[in-house]
Structure formats: structure tokens, C-alpha cells
């Protein structure tokens, strides 16, 4: 390879990345999933597009995709709160195992019929497209404030369901490649145990060792992210080499690191955020270059039928069956989880496996997987926000700081500096600082007015345009968001949580004459909190709601995981 060729490679690669970044701003305004934009740039630069770049190296695409997926899952794990496992772990694991198996079976039968394949070949197609994609889910849910049970279930499912898809794909490839020799039950059992057991053990064990190492050595701030990234990739590679799930390993490694105090935490998260964006862009650009759209025309109609069959039939059935034991999920929750069965890079990566194994119909599997991913991103990705609102699982947003950064007062410090800009609609504008009900342990470190830094006292009145710098912890963000929230411009947002708010220990009997409740012998002795448990179970999250006596009852406030306030929404505002 000549120096000129290398330079052209750098130029073209940088141009494609820059175009992808610039178009991402447009995608958010028109409602197109950003991953679809990256994929589209790659397709346009490819063989059938204006760019005319010929790229058909599946091994390079496999390498880039695996590396990118590892970085994305490491970052996703570090941003997942263990506290969300309280309501989401077992449902997510049920979806990640039984759900994937059911989706594989149903999709496989449809694929066998639509593409005139035998049942094993059809099941292989089902296994390839059977798992949701972490990159797509993390990307499209970012910035959306969903019901914690629903959001955490989707994120944990997407981070942990790939081992099942890999297990099914590898097993079916082995059966198809064995040409009548068969595959023993012991092989299948050991493969399953290796994928999940070894992947989990190496991820948690490697994460603990890396956490110990980070906190025992002193490095320049910029080297901590390098250490985390290299350590994560080491565990990812070792797990894959030993037959475990590297994807599960690096996700659990990130989960362990993200939920423990460690040096350089904020620098690590900041650098990983940029690396994750670069990984998403690089992965979908390469996959877009790999695709030749003209090849999809031959499979377009049956692949479209398969994609919609999976979206409207296979995924909903698998979700409802997998979540049967979990009564805390409402019908709306289940329908939304069914709709967010986003497919992304993982099915395309798995579709490379048959090509590397030299199976017949390998190109067909690849083209079908690519078509299913395109339809999923277009149909499910573009409608995700509307689906969340229709299912009533999206909570009203609270303002986040315009900037937040770590304050390294001591090595494991979890102090942060939050910066808020006060617009004219903020509740607190015009109020003296002494009247602000600041969360315990938080402090206003500075107040900027114009270009001047003021030294505020309790009598200082806040004005439009002021910038407040607040010292606090991550747990204070919700309270600070409420404190610096805007006056409602639309009435429906505050009324999401109800028109009136009640303490959970109030007896229903005392509310009956006010709201016209008709109470039977059992209900007249119940409190509001006991009514919640009766209808929703005891694992409650913000925004949980049910209809009773023509009223909507909504969990409106929690403290340390316990419900303290319930909102009542009147019928004409439902």
C-alpha cells in the first residue's frame, strides 16, 4: 500500500465521519434515528451510491463491528445503575433468554416458509435476527425519560441477550455444517453454559481486578480512560477465546466499574462518551459500505414480510410470554417493550458467521439480516418517541445541567459541579437565594451574571440569564432538576402526575366523600399506599398508574425507593 493510498484512506474516512457528525444534527430535528443516518452515509459512499467505493471485506467489517460493539457496551454498562436491577433484572433476563428463543423459533418458521428453506436454515435466520441490539437501544433511548421499569428492562435486555443469539447461531451453524453427523446434547449444554457462565464470571472478575488496579495506582488523568478501555478489551478477547460471551463480559465489567467509586471516574465517562460516538459512526459506516443495495432487491418482498412478521407477531408474543410471571408490568408496558425490539449491528455481525463457515445460502442470510435491520430502524426507531407517549411510559422531562464535571477533591471523590442557566420561565427567577429549598449537602459555589462572578448572599435575588454553579452529587440531580424547572408552558406536562396529590398513608374512607368513591367492605379499610400495592404490586416506580373508580392513580413521588406521594388525575384530564 503506497503512501498516497494511505493518505486517501485517511481523507475519505475523515470526510465520511465528518459528514455523519454534521448530519446527526439534522436527524434529531426530523426524527430519523441517528444510527440510520450513519448507515445511510455508508451506503451512499458504497458501490451503488455516488461514492462508488467497492468494499466487500467481511473479515474487516467483522473486526470493526466487534471492536465498536465492545466499546459501546462498556460505556452502556458504566452508565447503567445497579439500583435499576431492583425492578428490571429478572424480567430482562427472561427476555434475554426465553424471549430470544421464542423470537428465533417464530421468526425461523416464517423465514423457512418465505424463502423456501428447510426448518434448520429458517431457524438460523431467526437466530441471526433474534436479539435486540445494544447500540441501537442505548442510542435511541438516550435523552428519553422513560418509566424506570421499562427503560431499565430494555437496556439490561439489550446488553445481555446477545449470548443467547450467539449460542443459537453457533449451534445451528454447527448442525448445518455437520452434514448428518449431528451435534450432541452435551455440546449444546456446554456451549450454553460457556456463553453465559464464563462470560459473566470473566466480566465480573475482570471488572473487580480492574477496579482494584485503578484505585491503587496513580496515573495522569488522561490515562485512566485508556486503562479502562484496554482492560475491557482484554477481558472481551479472553472471554471470546475461551468460548464465553465477550459481549456479556465487557457489559458486566462496565456495570461493575460504573457502580463503584474509583479514580478518574468523570474523565473516564467523558472520554468513553466520545469513543462510543466514534464507534457507532465507524461501525455503521463500515456496515453501510459493505451493503450493495441492488442485492437486496431479490429478497425485498419476502424480507419485508419477515421484518413485519417479527415486529408485529414474533416479538410481541415473545415479550408477553417472557413477562407472564412479572405482574408489575402493565399492558402498556408490555406493548411498548414489544415495539422496542430494535435490531442493529449484532444481527449483521451474526450474519457474517455463516459466510465465514462457508454455508450454502450464506449471502441470503446476510441480505435478509441487513433488510430486517433497515426496516427495524426505519419503522421502530422513527416511531419510538410517539410509541412511548401513546403507551404513557414517557415521563415529563426535568431540566438537566448545561454542564456537569467531576470535582477531584480526593481520589474517589463523587462530588460534581452542576451548571444551570436560568431562563425567564424558571420558577426560581425573582426569588432570593434563601428561599431556594436546596437539597441537603448541595451548595451554590458561584453565581454568574453577564460576565461578572457575584458573591451571593441569602438576600441575592436570582435574575433571568443568571448562571448558577452548584456543588452536589449525582443523587441530587432529580431534586435540583425540580428546583430549577420551568413554569409549565403546556398544561398536560405537570398533570401527567395528577391534578391533586396525596400522602400514601391517607385512608380511602376519608377520600370517598371528596372524590365520590364507592368503597366495598375491603376498600374502606385500605390506605392509598395499600391500594397501590393491590393494583400494581410492591415494586413501584415513578409514573406507575392504574384506573380505578373513574380516576387515574399515579405514583408521583418516591424517596429512597419508597412511594411518598400519589397523584389523582380527574377523568376530563385523562
UniProtKB/Swiss-Prot annotation:
It catalyses: K(+)(in) + H(+)(out) = K(+)(out) + H(+)(in). It is found in: Cell inner membrane. Its main location: membrane. It holds the Pfam family Na_H_Exchanger. It is a multi-pass membrane protein. One of its GO terms (biological process) is cell volume homeostasis. Keywords: Antiport, Cell inner membrane, Cell membrane, Ion transport, Membrane, Potassium, Potassium transport, Transmembrane, Transmembrane helix, Transport. InterPro entries: Cation/H_exchanger_TM (IPR006153), FAD-bd_PCMH-like_sf (IPR036318), Na+/solute_symporter_sf (IPR038770), NhaP2 (IPR023729), RCK_C (IPR006037), RCK_C_sf (IPR036721), Transptr-assoc_dom (IPR005170). PROSITE patterns: RCK_C. The chain crosses the membrane at residues 6-26, 30-50, 58-78, 95-115, 119-139, 163-183, 191-211, 219-239, 242-262, 271-291, 301-321, 335-355, 364-384. Coiled coil: none annotated. It comes from the Bacteria. HAMAP family: NhaP2 (MF_01075). K(+)/H(+) antiporter that extrudes potassium in exchange for external protons and maintains the internal concentration of potassium under toxic levels. Belongs to the monovalent cation:proton antiporter 1 (CPA1) transporter (TC 2.A.36) family. NhaP2 subfamily. This is K(+)/H(+) antiporter NhaP2. It comes from Shewanella sediminis (strain HAW-EB3).
Amino acid at each position: 500500500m503506497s503512501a498516497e493510498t494511505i493518505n486517501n484512506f485517511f481523507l475519505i474516512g475523515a470526510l465520511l465521519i465528518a459528514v455523519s457528525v454534521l448530519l446527526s444534527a439534522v436527524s434529531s430535528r426530523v426524527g430519523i434515528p441517528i444510527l440510520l443516518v450513519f448507515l445511510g452515509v455508508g451506503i451512499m459512499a458504497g458501490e451503488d451510491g455516488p461514492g462508488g467505493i467497492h468494499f466487500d471485506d467481511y473479515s474487516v467489517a467483522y473486526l470493526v463491528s466487534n471492536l465498536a460493539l465492545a466499546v459501546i457496551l462498556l460505556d452502556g454498562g458504566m452508565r447503567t445503575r445497579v439500583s435499576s436491577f431492583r425492578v428490571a433484572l429478572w424480567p430482562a433476563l427472561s427476555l434475554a433468554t426465553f424471549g430470544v428463543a421464542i423470537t428465533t423459533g417464530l421468526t425461523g418458521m416464517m423465514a423457512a416458509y418465505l424463502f423456501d428453506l428447510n426448518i434448520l436454515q429458517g431457524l438460523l435466520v431467526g437466530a441471526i435476527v433474534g436479539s435486540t441490539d445494544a447500540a441501537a437501544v442505548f442510542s435511541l433511548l438516550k435523552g428519553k425519560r422513560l418509566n424506570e421499569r421499562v427503560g431499565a428492562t430494555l437496556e439490561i435486555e439489550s446488553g445481555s441477550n446477545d449470548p443467547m443469539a450467539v449460542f443459537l447461531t453457533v449451534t445451528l451453524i454447527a448442525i448445518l455444517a455437520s452434514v448428518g453427523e449431528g451435534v450432541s446434547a452435551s455440546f449444546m449444554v456446554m456451549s450454553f453454559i460457556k456463553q453465559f457462565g464464563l462470560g459473566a464470571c470473566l466480566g465480573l472478575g475482570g471488572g473487580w481486578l480492574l477496579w482494584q488496579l485503578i484505585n491503587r495506582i496513580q496515573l495522569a488523568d488522561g490515562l485512566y480512560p485508556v486503562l479502562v478501555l484496554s482492560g475491557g478489551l482484554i477481558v472481551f478477547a479472553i472471554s471470546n477465546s475461551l468460548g464465553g460471551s465477550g459481549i456479556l463480559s465487557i457489559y458486566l465489567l462496565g456495570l461493575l466499574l460504573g457502580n463503584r467509586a474509583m479514580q478518574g471516574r468523570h474523565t473516564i465517562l467523558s472520554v468513553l462518551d466520545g469513543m462510543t460516538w466514534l464507534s457507532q459512526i465507524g461501525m455503521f459506516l463500515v456496515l453501510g459500505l459493505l451493503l450493495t443495495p441492488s442485492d437486496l432487491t431479490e429478497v425485498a418482498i419476502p424480507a419485508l414480510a419477515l421484518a413485519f412478521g417479527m415486529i408485529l407477531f414474533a416479538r410481541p408474543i415473545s415479550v408477553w410470554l417472557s413477562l407472564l410471571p412479572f405482574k408489575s408490568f402493565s399492558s402498556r408496558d408490555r406493548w411498548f417493550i414489544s415495539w422496542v425490539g430494535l435490531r442493529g449491528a449484532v444481527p449483521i455481525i451474526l450474519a457474517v458467521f455463516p459466510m465465514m463457515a462457508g454455508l450454502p445460502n450464506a449471502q441470503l442470510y446476510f441480505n435478509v439480516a441487513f433488510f430486517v435491520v433497515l426496516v427495524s430502524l426505519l419503522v421502530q426507531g422513527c416511531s419510538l418517541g410517539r410509541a412511548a407517549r401513546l403507551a404513557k411510559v414517557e415521563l415529563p422531562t426535568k431540566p438537566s445541567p448545561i454542564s456537569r464535571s467531576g470535582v477531584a477533591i480526593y481520589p474517589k471523590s463523587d462530588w460534581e459541579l452542576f451548571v444551570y442557566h436560568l431562563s425567564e420561565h424558571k420558577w426560581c427567577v425573582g426569588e432570593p437565594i434563601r428561599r431556594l429549598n436546596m437539597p441537603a449537602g448541595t451548595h451554590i459555589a458561584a453565581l454568574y451574571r453577564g460576565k461578572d462572578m457575584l458573591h451571593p448572599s441569602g438576600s441575592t435575588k436570582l435574575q433571568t440569564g443568571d448562571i448558577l454553579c452548584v456543588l452536589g452529587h449525582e443523587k441530587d440531580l432529580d431534586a435540583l432538576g425540580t428546583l430549577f424547572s420551568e413554569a409549565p408552558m403546556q398544561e398536560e406536562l405537570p398533570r401527567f402526575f395528577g391534578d391533586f396529590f396525596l400522602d400514601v398513608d391517607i385512608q380511602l374512607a376519608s377520600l370517598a366523600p371528596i372524590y365520590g368513591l364507592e368503597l366495598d367492605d375491603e376498600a374502606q379499610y385500605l390506605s392509598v399506599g395499600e391500594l397501590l400495592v393491590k393494583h400494581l404490586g410492591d415494586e413501584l416506580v415513578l409514573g406507575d398508574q392504574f384506573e380505578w373508580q373513574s380516576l387515574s392513580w399515579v405514583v408521583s413521588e418516591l424517596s429512597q425507593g419508597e412511594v411518598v406521594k400519589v397523584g389523582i388525575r380527574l377523568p376530563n384530564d385523562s
